[in-house]
């Protein structure tokens, strides 16, 4: 039976995208991790999978910017985005360099390492960024695409999720199922994506002749454990609950659902929940979570395509590319 990338990843506790980068002799992975993978292949009798000498390709650089780490973390969402970037980069004949930048330390100092290896273009994972955070990167004077965030007054190409469309579709589904008392499980960590989803929720509610009462707005930490603990504290105050909740992402939905179940509520009989992103935890939830699907790999692939267009000077204008979403109906929403 052939050895698969995910098998090696599981054995070593690394992501499949890391193994893929190493097997394809791509840069951006530490030598220690690279050697661990080579050692495991040799141990299992698959030394033939160890790549030969590196081919000299031009470089693209992916910068994963963590301002606080409250949202950007080692989740399926971001691993899929990175996999899309890697796939399209290789397909286009480039190497991929990967750097992590911490917003907690002086960014200018962290950018010095960029001068140690040349790159033709930069993809900036800007999920946790504000417009001010972009300034040091603009001084690099290289083609750049901002991924997963858009800043209206910054002249920069961007590839983003159509968050308002997705949130509006979620609310529309709830209203079509008869819900009029709809609550919102909103992240207590600010990022542009969540703010746009909030705008979509409010717009869709108004379009249906409904409002979002302050008492139905629950502020939760955007992780499974964080949302669970936040929801437990809120439920201990015995609030009046809506008949349905929209959550900023699947992690919040799953954590909140766990707290609701422990408090004696049955989903969806007592309360319906709908998430956003369509991560594996959504399908694994009991009952499986209705959610909004985001084409994660496509986000990454489009960012690479747009960056290469810049490098090749195919277009001069700045472009915002919005990637559409769609509803995935499972079993966490019922008609009332």
Question: What does each model-found stretch correspond to?
Answer:
Residues 58-172, 235-236, 240, 251:
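Alpha-helical recognition/docking segments in bacterial nutrient-uptake
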Residues 65-80, 98-105, 159-169, 185-232, ...:
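Hinge/beta->alpha junction and helix N-cap segments in small-molecule ligand-binding domains
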Residues 95, 143, 180, 211, ...:
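Residue-level detector of anion-binding/catalytic polar loops
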Residues 119-125, 183-186, 217, 239-249, ...:
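Periplasmic-binding protein-like
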Residues 230-336:
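Flexible loop/turn connectors
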């Amino acid at each position: 039976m052939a050895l698969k990338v995910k098998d090696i990843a599981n054995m070593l506790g690394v992501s499949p995208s890391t193994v893929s980068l190493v097997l394809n002799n791509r840069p951006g992975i530490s030598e220690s991790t690279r050697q661990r993978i080579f050692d495991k292949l040799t141990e299992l009798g698959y030394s033939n999978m160890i790549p030969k000498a590196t081919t000299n390709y031009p470089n693209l650089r992916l910068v994963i910017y963590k301002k606080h780490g409250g949202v950007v973390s080692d989740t399926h969402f971001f691993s899929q985005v990175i996999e899309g970037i890697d796939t399209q980069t290789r397909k286009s004949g480039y190497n991929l360099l990967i750097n992590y930048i911490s917003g907690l330390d002086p960014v200018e100092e962290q950018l010095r390492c960029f001068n140690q290896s040349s790159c033709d273009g930069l993809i900036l994972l800007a999920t946790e960024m504000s417009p001010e955070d972009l300034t040091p990167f603009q001084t690099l004077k290289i083609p750049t695409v901002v991924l997963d965030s858009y800043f209206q007054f910054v002249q920069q190409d961007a590839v983003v999720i159509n968050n308002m469309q997705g949130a509006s579709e979620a609310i529309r589904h709830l209203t079509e199922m008869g819900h009029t008392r709809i609550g919102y499980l909103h992240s207590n960590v600010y990022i542009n994506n969540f703010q746009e989803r909030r705008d979509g929720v409010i717009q869709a509610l108004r379009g249906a002749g409904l409002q979002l009462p302050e008492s139905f707005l629950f502020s939760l930490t955007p992780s499974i454990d964080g949302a669970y603990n936040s929801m437990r504290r809120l439920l201990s105050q015995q609030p009046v609950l809506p008949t349905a909740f929209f959550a900023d992402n699947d992690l919040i939905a799953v954590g909140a659902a766990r707290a609701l179940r422990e408090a004696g509520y049955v989903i969806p009989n007592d309360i319906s929940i709908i998430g956003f992103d369509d991560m594996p935890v959504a399908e694994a939830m009991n009952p499986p979570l209705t959610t909004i699907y985001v084409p994660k790999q496509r986000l990454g692939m489009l960012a690479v395509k747009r960056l290469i267009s810049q490098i090749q000077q195919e277009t001069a204008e700045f472009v915002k590319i919005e990637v559409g979403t769609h509803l995935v109906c499972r079993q966490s929403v019922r008609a009332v």
